Amino acid sequence: MELTRRQAIRTGLLGAAGLAAGGTLTACGGGSSSGGSAAAMTLWYWSGGLSPSVVTDATKKFASQTKLTSSVIGGDFKQKLLTTMTSRRYVPDITGIKGEDMPAMLPDADRFVDLNTLGAAKLKSQYLSWKWAQGMTTDGKLIGFPIDIGPTAMFYRSDLFAQAGLPTDPTTVAAQMKTWDEYFAAGVELHKAIPKTYLVDNAGDIFTAVVGQSGSRFIDSSGKFVGDQDHIRTAWDTAVKTVTLGIDAKINDNSWNGNIANGTVGSVIGAAWHALDIEQAAPALSGKWRVAATPDGPSDNGGSFLAIPTTCPDPALAFQIITWILNPTNQARGFTDEALFPSTPASYTMSALTSGDKYFGGQKTIEVFGPAAQNIPNQYVAPADSAVSAPYYNQLINVENGTSSDSAWSAAVSQAKQIFAQQGGS
């Protein structure tokens, strides 16, 4: 069974600690072999990473200049890319890089073309500034060109909210559940009225959202571990409240789809791309889900980039292909085809985004996601962020299984510090 994007990100976070000691590229000299040539180019991405129809059109558009061959790579995309780049064989000329993997790629920026040398700066104003910064090194090299972003929102079952006597209109829901405490209070009422239904799918998703709302993560820009400081503890305590209040469904496995479909989960805090996951999990619930603003403000979860390895025989042409695939019009198509929320604000006024979404009762979800996208805090994400954050998610599962919050917190911080040290932190 193919993992949804939310499952893939969760799996990556929970497994990151085990890979903490060996996740970077090894440096090597010239003489690399590439899967492409001046007459042919290869593009790697993962299922759902780009609009297939846009990629097909790119193949046709640039047919007079190159034979563009695209490959949808299954399994562990990052590891397969690292393996081919290290072996210097069959390296793609254009490759996707997942947002959660970009921080680990930035220290090896010399393995990718600096897109600024190809004129990327002239296009910067068309893309969200915080997203643009995520693909840039501290010394100003741009290795990742923005694909999509993951502005968060509250997805909720309007029919279950109505049954519990809660508001159902997205504007009213946002106004009455503008803080986490107000949202959780509504969850208590929901579970009281419908005992089989819980407000959230798991505590980890709440932790992710609250960390994303703060100005800092687990390692600051000076390289200092800050995973034991107040902003992380606040996110932890907020997530744990869902457990202590009895409004957490504690779903951390592949039963997520079934629990979305059977009404166990009454709402989900997730990125824009969760819309497709929910629709695929529960097509029969079309018209019953709605979207409202995230309590206490937006955050980002997911989103990816395209990059050009230095082995590419014609970086200038590769860049032309990338910028065409990711222009505002084609990003709007990506939203229609794959629920890839555009990193280009100009797309937000296009019909692909302004039309009502049938699955969400005809709601114009851009009215929620658009403002969220433009108000996401800019955070520094260290190369070791995924590995260092993994213990917090593992320990939150332990809290869901009965471990005390304080005990699990201490274990999470201790384990995170150990991983930080293994990654070269001090």
Language-model regions: role of each:
Residues E2-A104, L123, A316-L317, T329, ...:
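Conserved N-terminal structural module of periplasmic/extracytoplasmic solute-binding proteins
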Residues S64, K241, I247, A281-P342, ...:
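Extracytoplasmic/periplasmic substrate-recognition and gating elements
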Residues V72-L81, E100, Q176-E182, A249-N262:
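Short helix-initiation/N-cap motifs at beta->coil->alpha
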Residues D93-G96, G266-A271:
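Paired acidic/hydrophobic, glycine-rich loop segments that form the ligand-binding mouth/hinge
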Residues K98-A153, R290, K358, G370-P371:
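Hinge/lid segment of periplasmic solute-binding proteins
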Residues D101-L106, A272-L285:
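A ligand-binding cleft/hinge motif common to bilobed small-molecule-binding domains
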Residues F184-V188, S222-D253:
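Glycine-centered hinge/linker elements that transmit conformational signals in sensory
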Residues G361-A416:
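C-terminal capping/gating helix-and-loop segments adjacent to ligand/active sites or protein-protein/ligand interfaces
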